[in-house]
């Protein structure tokens, strides 16, 4: 039996369900999910292995017009990834027509030799007439090998999407062991899980002015518990107060919720300590971005 393997990137506007889709396929919480846009900052590499194929997924930041150095970094990662892969999944969600954000990405995809599959997500929220109308509009662009409707959250039609992807995989080796589902360091995943909870507990302009650095991650000697220290960086003193909350209640909520997810990830009890520090304009500081892993 021949074995197929290859690399697939997932692109799309912020907040269309790219990370939800990848997490549904992999079956583990690897990519950060939030109801706020631009939540994925690093090119997360996840691995899905079956007996006769292996797919390596690259979950890129949403392609958008950048407003700062961090935004430039995110878009650079997303567009460069298109050159490295065997197939591209372009994820869009419900709407009445192709919006300017999706049209911007379509323009970026013109002339790309890599096979592109359009994934219409959130079909559970669309009626048949709207779905058919969108299908026709995207088909007229002429750049998609296939168009498929799914619900990433519910898992509807995701199996058929996988079958489509496998068609474009070349024969190749297992790039990663069967048990491996990501190449990301645990410290980075822990930081992203904490940042997800910050996005959940805060609002307005605060979330995307926030970064998390895991400074300590160590198993206690002779005990089934991992000590984790992490620093939350924000850009304004007022943001620090909002993240901490009255009497520290909001920070405690962030910590408790993050700890529960981290314990599931690591399969161990976790003692999590969080600090909040102000680092003004960190998104435009190349040194700070490099320190936080955005290089």
Swiss-Prot record:
The keyword rRNA-binding applies. The lineage of its organism: Bacteria, Bacillati, Bacillota, Clostridia, Peptostreptococcales. It comes from the Bacteria. Residues 59-62 are annotated as: G3. An essential GTPase that binds both GDP and GTP, with rapid nucleotide exchange. Plays a role in 16S rRNA processing and 30S ribosomal subunit biogenesis and possibly also in cell cycle regulation and energy metabolism. Belongs to the TRAFAC class TrmE-Era-EngA-EngB-Septin-like GTPase superfamily. Era GTPase family. PROSITE patterns: G_ERA, KH_TYPE_2. HAMAP family: GTPase_Era. It holds the Pfam family MMR_HSR1. It comes from Alkaliphilus oremlandii (strain OhILAs). The keyword Metal-binding does not apply. This is GTPase Era. Residues 150-152 are annotated as: G5. Residues 194-280 form the KH type-2 domain. It is a peripheral membrane protein. Residues 4-171 form the Era-type G domain. It is found in: Cytoplasm; Cell membrane. Gene3D superfamilies: 3.30.300.20, P-loop containing nucleotide triphosphate hydrolases. GTP binds at residues 12-19, 59-63, 121-124. One of its GO terms (cellular component) is cytosol. Residues 38-42 are annotated as: G2. Transmembrane segments: none annotated.
């Amino acid at each position: 039996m021949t074995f197929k393997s290859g690399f697939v990137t997932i692109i799309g506007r912020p907040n269309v369900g790219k990370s939800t889709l990848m997490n549904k396929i992999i079956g583990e919480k690897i990519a950060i999910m939030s109801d706020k846009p631009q939540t994925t900052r690093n090119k997360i590499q996840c691995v899905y292995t079956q007996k006769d194929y292996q797919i390596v997924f690259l979950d890129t930041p949403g392609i958008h017009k950048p407003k700062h150095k961090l935004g430039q970094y995110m878009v650079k990662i997303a567009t460069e990834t298109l050159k490295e892969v065997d197939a591209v999944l372009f994820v869009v969600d419900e709407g009445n027509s192709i919006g300017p954000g999706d049209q911007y990405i379509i323009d970026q995809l013109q002339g790309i030799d890599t096979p592109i599959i359009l994934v219409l997500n959130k079909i559970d929220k669309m009626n048949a007439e709207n779905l058919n109308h969108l299908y026709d509009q995207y088909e007229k662009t002429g750049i998609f090998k296939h168009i498929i409707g799914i619900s990433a959250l519910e898992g509807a039609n995701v199996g058929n999407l996988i079958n489509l992807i496998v068609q474009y995989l070349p024969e190749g080796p297992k790039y990663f062991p069967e048990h491996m589902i990501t190449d990301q360091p645990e410290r980075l995943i822990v930081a992203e899980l904490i940042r997800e909870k910050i996005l959940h507990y805060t609002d307005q302009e605060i979330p995307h002015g926030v970064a998390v650095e895991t400074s300590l991650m160590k198993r206690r000697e002779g005990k089934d518990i991992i000590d984790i220290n992490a620093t939350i960086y924000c850009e304004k003193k007022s943001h620090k107060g909002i993240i901490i909350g009255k009497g520290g209640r909001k920070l405690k909520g962030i910590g408790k919720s993050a700890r529960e997810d981290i314990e599931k990830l690591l399969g161990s009890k976790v003692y999590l300590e969080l600090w909040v520090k102000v680092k003004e304009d960190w998104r435009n500081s190349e040194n700070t971005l490099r320190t936080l892993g955005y290089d």
